[in-house]
Amino acid sequence: MIVALKPGVTQESREQLMDWLQNLGLHIHVSEGEYQTILGLVGDTTKVDMDLVASLDIVDSVKRVTEPFKCCNRKFHPEDTVVEVGDVKIGGGNFCVMAGPCSVESEEQIVAVAKAVKASGANMLRGGAFKPRTSPYDFAGLKAEGLELLKIARQETGLPIVTEIMSVVDLPLFEDVDVLQVGARNMQNFDLLRELGKLRKPILLKRGLANTLKELLMSAEYIMASGNEQVVLCERGIRTFSDYTRNTLDLAAVPMLRELTHLPIIVDPSHATGIARLVPPMALAGAACGADGLIIEVHNDPMHALCDGAQSLRPEEYVKLAEKVRGIREVIGK
C-alpha cells in the first residue's frame, strides 16, 4: 500500500501517522521527493482502513500495490535511486562503466588492464576471483589471492573494484571489496541474498539465464527487505532458441525495468554475446536504450586468457568503444 502525504506536512504529524501504522505490524519505507513524501507500507495491509487513512488531513491519496515486489517498486519510490561507490554514482542520470578482465590471472595482468581502462574513462574495475564455471575442469579463479590482486590494482589506479561472490561462507573475504556481484547462476540463491541484505555495500545483481523480470525484482526484494537498498540490476542476456550468440541480450528489459523499479540498471554486452566483435554494437545499443551503465570485459591478451577470451576486448578496442559510448550519450541528451 502507498500513502502519499500532502506537501508541507510537519514532521510531528508524519511521525504520528507512522507510529500508528507501525503499531499495526507494518514496515514503512519513506521516500521523500522534492514536492511530496510517500510512505510505502509492507506487511498485512488488510488491517488498514483505506478510507480512514485517506480521510486524514495530511494524506493526499492511498493506493494498493498489487505487485509482489515492494521495496524496489517505483510506486513506493518514484525518484531514481542513486547508488554511490566512493565518488562514483550509478543511476539518476549518472552513467557508470565497469571494465576489466573476466578473471584475475596475475598482478601484472590486472594492474595493466586497470590502468588501461582508467585512462579511457572507466569508473570501476571488474575482475573475477571466484568463477562459477560450467565445467569442473575449467579455471575457477584465483579465489582469495585474486581478491588481493584486485586490491593492489585499486591501490595503483584508485578505481573501485567489483567482483563476484558465490557463497555465504566466503563473505569474510569480501569485507574490503567495494561492490559485490551476484552472478546469473546465483540470482535465486536466497540464503546468499539475505546475507547480502545485511551488509552496507552496493550489490550488483545479474539477471539469471532464464529468469523473468519479476523474478529478478523479487531477488532484489530479498536484498532490500533485509536492509540493504544499494542494489544495481544487470541485464546480461537470457537463453533462447537462438544459437548464433551465447545468449540473447534483452534490451527491452531496460526501459521496462525503468517503469517498474527505481533501481539503477546496467547492461553486460560481453556475456550476452560471447563474441568480442559484437560487444561494441550491443554496448552502444545498451547506452542508447537508457541503461545507467555498462560492464565490459577487457583483457590485454585475449588469445591467452584463462577465461572468456573470445568475448574480451583488447585495451585499444575498449578505448574506441568508450569514445563512441560518450557520443551516444550526447546524442540521447544524457
Question: What function would you assign to each model-found segment?
Answer:
Residues 96-101, 123-127, 161-163, 180-182, ...:
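Hydrophobic faces of well-ordered beta-strands that scaffold small-molecule active sites
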